[in-house]
Amino acid sequence: MKKPLKIILIILAVIVGLVAALLIWLTATQLNVKTETAVVTHGENSTASFAPGDDVSILTWNVGYAGLGEESDFFMDGGKQVRAPSKAVAEKNMDGIVSTVEALDADFTFLQEIEADPSTRSYGIEEAERMRTETGLDTAHARNYKCAFVPYPIPPIGKVSSGIMTLATAPIASAERIALPSPFKWPVSVANLKRCLMPVYIDLEGTDAQLVLVNLHLEAYDDGEGKAAQTAALKSFLEQEYAKGNYVIAGGDFNQTFPGGLDKYPIKNAELWTPGTLDDSMLPDGWRFAYDTSAPTCRLDNQPYDAESDATQHYVIDGFILSPNVELTSVQTQDDGFRFSDHNPVLLNIRLK
């Protein structure tokens, strides 16, 4: 064998070996959906109580790991960045997220894309811990993204440990992590999210029924089959809980447009990210969506936010599903101009029948 060819083969063998070693390492350290069933709960400070007939407020907000504020774009949406331009910007976003949650003062808050542990993309900010300590509320947190090193793009995303979090003014009786079907196969799956539902159970006074609050963040970057399968699993779970006599509310980032959302905010460029669609017909009799189209709940991260730009794409993909024994009082998107996240908070007010 000629020496140049031998050198090339050695180099190729080393590259293949390194890639194989990386895949083995990532596979061994990824979030294991078969064993990751526990939800981390904190606090014994919350003392509010609720009963049938009471009013309840619930906030949902995808906070974008404090990395997708007005200054940012994102490579998966047609932008270039993998995180906020600087740690100072990420800190600004996190400060704004905490202060906004405190100002809206909901009885329960559903957060998505909040880091469970320090992550590269959020400059090591202790996001879940900050939210717990600064609000002083009882919390539940379930991870849906754990990867020791996401190797793409260039520069890479790096280490990620993130998930969904619920804040409660009432004591949390229990909480679960329920795995959702994934559209991704190995090896792509090792660096992707492992989506889940996180139901939190709140005891109600004067009844054996519970208030079941389901925090969710459904699939984003798939061909649509993942969203459909996860939505079907969500529907099945909600019906099971309602059949037990419980009051059931699901909320979060559906990554699917609510009815009428595309009429208000039509797709401008179908070559960029396009959400799935939700339809009222998917819900059983008596169930309903709760959402607000008066302001967008999400923007496309193809560029830093510019409300006046023709390239700016808005969506309505954040909202709620209510069981028949839950009466909708109001739902309003809090239009904050996407200062701290690429999503706006959505505030729901309901009454337990």
Give the label of every model feature segment.
Residues 57-63, 93-121, 167, 200-202, ...:
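Active-site beta-strand/loop signature of hydrolases that rely on acidic residues for catalysis
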Residues 5-11, 23-46, 236-249, 256-353:
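Metal-dependent phosphoester-hydrolase catalytic domains
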Residues 139-147, 175-181, 330-334:
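Conserved S-adenosyl-L-methionine
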Residues 133-136, 159-175, 202-203, 311-327, ...:
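Conserved beta strand-loop-helix elements of the APE1-like EEP
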Residues 36, 148-211, 215:
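A well-ordered secondary-structure block
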Residues 63-66, 115-118, 145-148, 172-173, ...:
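Solvent-exposed loop/turn segments at secondary-structure junctions
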Residues 80-87, 114-117, 181-189, 217-225:
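Surface-exposed cleft-lining segments at the edges of enzyme active sites
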Residues 3-133, 137, 141-152, 156-161, ...:
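N-terminal, active-site-proximal structural segment of metallo-dependent hydrolase catalytic domains
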